[in-house]
Structures are given as C-alpha cells and as structure tokens.
Amino acid sequence: SVDAAFQIAMDVLDKARNQQYALEGEHGMWSAGAFQGTGMGFGVWCRDTMQMLLRGIGFIDPKVTRRTVEYILKSGKDNAVDGLAAVVISVWEYYLVSHDRELLLKNADTIKEKIQQCEEVFNRENGLVYAAFCSSNDAYEDSEAGGYALSTEIYFMYAFECAFNILKCIGEPAEHYKVLAAQMLEMIRNKYWNPTAGIFTSGPDGSVAFKDEVWE
C-alpha cells in the first residue's frame, strides 16, 4: 500500500541522516546511502543531494537539508562535471521549500563562484556542456553519448535557470543566465530529438546513441 511504501521510505531517510552511518565531519546531513553498514556510510554527494531535493527532501527535515546544502557548497563528493550543476540546483530547490534568503545572502560569494564554474564548462559554439558522463552513473563514461550525455545537459540547463532565479533573488545581474538556459533548451530539442525513434536519445545527432536510438 501507499502507507507501507511511505513508511519504508521514511525509514531509509532516517538512516540517511543517522549519525551511525555518517562519515567524519558529515554528521547531521543527508548521506547518499547507508548500505555499507554502521560507520561505513557513503558520504554526502553533490548529485545525490540534488536528487533528494528535487524529490522534496526539504519538507522532511529543513535543518538537516540546510546543513547539507551549505556543506556541498564548500565540499561534497562528485565524480564528474554534473556536480557543478547539482550544487546550484540544490541551492534553489532548497530555497523554493524554505524561502531561506539568509542562506543565499550568507553564501552569496560561494554560490556565484559555483555559477561561474558552470558557465566555464559551457561551450558557446555548440550551446552545450562537454559531458562524457551521464548523471545516472557518473562514475563511468557514457561512450555512446559522444561526450554530450543528455541527462547532464538537462541538469546544466536547469542550473542556469536556477542561477537566474538565485541572482535575481539577491539583487545581482541575472538575465545572462536566463539566456544561457534558453539556448541550451533549444539545442537539446534540436540535437537530441530522434524523430524516427520518437524519443530524446542519450546522445546528440551524430552520436552512437542517436544512431542506435538509445535512451539513457
């Protein structure tokens, strides 16, 4: 039943913030996983924090969520370039739930630095970010995507949207990032939609994924 599934989910979340599973220096935060046993937690990851926030974790425990977001702004684990987008998205998703403007102002310099890092990996010539790794498994290169994995492109597009909203909220120039987000959205629609397959493939036109009609 739905109630049973909810209780299982809450039990998993309780372990994810449990001190028994936390790594040193990461107590009171959302860990990416507790499956390795007591004292052997998986740690606080940028990508996994983003995924939890996109699924509403901020409503469950706002204090733990804030602590986690502030942590990944300065630290946090990641394997690939998607970790940059994940941090910016996490900040905005937390704000949407909390309206905690104090966090934005307190960490404004660090947030702007993360936004700048996102822009630094953006290729203005093709309107995409070089992303050899898909976000669903960013420990292994997605060779079929031809260096431009769809999921990571989508996260960067949304990260630029979040950057626009964050900067606007704290009174900083923001319009530039709205333009970047729109440019990425256009390129994703143009390059990844495979009309024969009727899907967005995990790589753009010209990649193995596009040719073989592979969906991530």
Regions found by a protein language model. Give the residues of each.
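Generic detector of bulky aromatic hydrophobic side chains
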Residues: 10, 14, 50, 114, ...
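Extended, well-ordered alpha-helical scaffold segments
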Residues: 4-9, 61-74, 101-119, 163, ...
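Substrate-binding groove/exosite segments of carbohydrate-active enzymes
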Residues: 1-105, 201, 206, 210-216
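Conserved helix-loop functional segments at active or binding sites
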Residues: 15-19, 61, 93-96, 120, ...
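The feature captures the catalytic groove of carbohydrate-active enzymes
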Residues: 77-82, 116-182, 186, 193-216
